[in-house]
């Protein structure tokens, strides 16, 4: 999955199906389960000091937040439209960079949102310091991004190819 504009997110069909299944579960069976937990905890009496009740309500809040996130994500999804292989870094691309121009010190990563993170390859969000620094650059260009300590780091774009995972 990758951000292709402010609101549109590119997803593979597989990622779309997984997120849709998660949304269906959270909107159906998971809501029923959490409602039952809340009802059971409520029957225990005093809600002010009822740890089970408060834990269930907190879980419900997190679950509803995820439902809203998934709903928005899927409403704005473009399925199957991979980024162009034109040498420009864009979300949905596997990018190879060299740190400080040292071509022996490289990193391969997927520029994509966290929902698309894979165990196969490190993923950086387009909104992360590194992601925003390289996004839009072309192969051969240099990019800079701010480190957590406030210093600037320089990288050279060696390769940018559409993700095939």
UniProtKB/Swiss-Prot annotation:
Belongs to the GreA/GreB family. Gene3D superfamilies: Transcription elongation factor, GreA/GreB, C-terminal domain (3.10.50.30), Transcription elongation factor, GreA/GreB, N-terminal domain (1.10.287.180). It comes from Streptomyces avermitilis (strain ATCC 31267 / DSM 46492 / JCM 5070 / NBRC 14893 / NCIMB 12804 / NRRL 8165 / MA-4680). GO terms for biological process: DNA-templated transcription elongation; regulation of DNA-templated transcription elongation. Residues 55-78 form a coiled coil. Necessary for efficient RNA polymerase transcription elongation past template-encoded arresting sites. The arresting sites in DNA have the property of trapping a certain fraction of elongating RNA polymerases that pass through, resulting in locked ternary complexes. Cleavage of the nascent transcript by cleavage factors such as GreA or GreB allows the resumption of elongation from the new 3'terminus. GreA releases sequences of 2 to 3 nucleotides. Keywords: Coiled coil, DNA-binding, Transcription, Transcription regulation. This is Transcription elongation factor GreA. HAMAP family: GreA_GreB. GO terms for molecular function: DNA binding; RNA polymerase binding.
């Amino acid at each position: 999955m990758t951000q292709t504009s402010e609101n549109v997110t590119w997803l593979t069909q597989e990622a779309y199906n997984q997120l849709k299944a998660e949304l269906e579960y959270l909107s159906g069976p998971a809501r029923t389960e959490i409602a039952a937990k809340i009802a059971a905890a409520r029957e225990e009496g005093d809600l002010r000091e009822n740890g089970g009740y408060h834990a269930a309500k907190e879980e419900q809040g997190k679950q509803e937040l995820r439902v809203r996130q998934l709903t928005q994500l899927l409403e704005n999804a473009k399925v199957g439209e991979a980024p162009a292989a034109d040498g420009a870094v864009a979300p949905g691309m596997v990018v190879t960079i060299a740190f400080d121009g040292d071509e022996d010190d490289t990193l391969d990563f997927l520029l994509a949102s966290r929902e698309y993170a894979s165990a196969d390859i490190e993923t950086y969000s387009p909104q992360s310091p590194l992601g925003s620094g390289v996004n839009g650059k072309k192969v051969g260009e240099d990019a800079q991004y701010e480190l957590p300590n406030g210093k600037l780091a320089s990288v050279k774009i060696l390769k940018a190819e559409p993700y095939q995972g």
